């Protein structure tokens, strides 16, 4: 069942974030990524598989230097943008990652686009405001 798979994937993700299991983090992340990939394939019109893959790969690349989470945040965002009732916090997380990714890559124009999207969703968002203030 997809729901059970999804919950098992989240269990692995949260185990990977627990400091008591840091030695097993790569194993938990690999398992979670595999499960969320299956969820994304089985339910392609739902953002959750890609969104959680993004979170997993963000843990694998904490400095965002490799952009491992980028394709999954983009995929989740493309699904979410088709849904008028999309959860704002999820939209903000996707756009924040992508804004930061492009900032790290020194593509400031692209970075600004994502930070501005956040301000359209949440005009009081301090992170987006600070990020835009830091881009020349």
Please place each PLM-identified region on the residue numbering.
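Conserved small/polar residues in nucleotide/adenosyl-binding loops
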Residues: 1-5
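Canonical positions in the second alpha-helix
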Residues: 38-39, 76, 118
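Residue-level recognition of tetratricopeptide repeat
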Residues: 46, 91, 124-125
């Amino acid at each position: 069942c997809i729901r059970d798979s999804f919950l098992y994937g989240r269990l692995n993700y949260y185990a990977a974030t627990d400091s008591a299991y840091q030695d097993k983090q790569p194993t938990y992340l690999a398992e979670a990524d595999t499960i969320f990939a299956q969820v994304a394939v089985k339910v392609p019109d739902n953002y959750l598989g890609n969104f959680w893959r993004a979170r997993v790969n963000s843990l694998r690349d904490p400095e965002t230097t490799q952009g491992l989470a980028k394709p999954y945040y983009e995929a989740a965002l493309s699904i979410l943008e088709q849904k008028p009732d999309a959860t704002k916090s999820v939209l903000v997380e996707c756009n924040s990652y992508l804004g930061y990714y492009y900032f790290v890559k020194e593509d400031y124009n692209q970075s600004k686009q994502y930070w501005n999207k956040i301000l359209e969703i949440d005009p009081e968002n301090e992170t987006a405001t600070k990020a835009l203030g830091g881009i020349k």
